[in-house]
UniProtKB/Swiss-Prot annotation:
Gene name as annotated: rplF
GO molecular function, one term: rRNA binding
Subunit structure: Part of the 50S ribosomal subunit.
General function of this protein: This protein binds to the 23S rRNA, and is important in its secondary structure. It is located near the subunit interface in the base of the L7/L12 stalk, and near the tRNA binding site of the peptidyltransferase center.
Domain of life, per lineage: Bacteria
Annotated GO CC locations: cytosolic large ribosomal subunit
Listed PROSITE patterns: RIBOSOMAL_L6_1
Alphabetized Pfam families for the sequence: Ribosomal_L6
Protein name: Large ribosomal subunit protein uL6
HAMAP family: Ribosomal_uL6_B
InterPro entries reported in the protein's UniProt record: Ribosomal_uL6-like, Ribosomal_uL6-like_a/b-dom_sf, Ribosomal_uL6_a/b-dom, Ribosomal_uL6_bac-type, Ribosomal_uL6_CS
Single GO biological process annotation from the record: cytoplasmic translation
Keywords attached to this entry: Ribonucleoprotein, Ribosomal protein, RNA-binding, rRNA-binding
Assigned protein family: Belongs to the universal ribosomal protein uL6 family.
Organism: Pseudomonas syringae pv. tomato (strain ATCC BAA-871 / DC3000)
């Protein structure tokens, strides 16, 4: 059984939470995020904390309470600190350049790849082979990073491709005669 929902979510200073019906709104220094809460989950705000409880004790409801707690915790962290994901380009001639809401990638194809960034996401290129994806929505930051990585995944023989900065690519040995 998950015990995630038993831990309260602490609200840092500057973060405001508003619950209207089943709509939860979290507002902070970096922006506002909204979430529709499942009807089987009950949320109580007390003393700068949010507490989560299942309305009845069955397994699915308890699981939903834990999931809701994790999502709200990510929202609170996002509007106060934000999230970032770092990508690296490994390969000869692989380059990235951020131009406003478009990320221009040269990944060894016969054409450049232009990736349109969704609202709420910013991309920085500190160097030609590093990409920093930033935003307040953890799911969206991870989704954008995964979509960029999917253009050219790291291959196991030379390790060329787009990889997460903390990713370890398993290498294979070349075929021997």
């Amino acid at each position: 059984m998950s015990r995630v929902a038993k831990n309260p979510v602490k609200l840092p200073s500057g973060v405001e939470v508003k619950l209207v019906g089943q709509q939860l709104s979290v507002k902070g220094a970096k922006g506002t995020l909204e979430l529709i809460i499942h009807s089987s989950v009950e949320i109580v705000e007390e003393a700068g904390e949010l507490r989560f409880a299942a309305r009845n004790g069955d397994q699915q409801t308890r699981a939903m309470a834990g999931t809701t707690r994790a999502l709200v915790n990510n929202m609170v962290q996002g509007v106060s600190q934000g999230f970032e994901r770092k990508l690296q380009l490994v390969g000869v001639g692989y380059k990235a350049q951020a131009k406003g809401t478009v990320l221009n990638l040269a990944l060894g194809f016969s054409h450049p790849v232009d990736y349109e960034l969704p609202n709420g996401i910013t991309a920085e290129t500190p160097s030609q082979t590093d990409i920093l994806i930033r935003g307040i929505d953890k799911q969206l930051v991870g989704q954008v990073a995964a979509e960029i990585r999917d253009f050219r995944r790291p291959e196991p023989y030379k390790g060329k491709g787009v990889r997460y900065a903390d990713e370890v690519v398993r290498r294979k040995e070349a075929k021997k005669k």
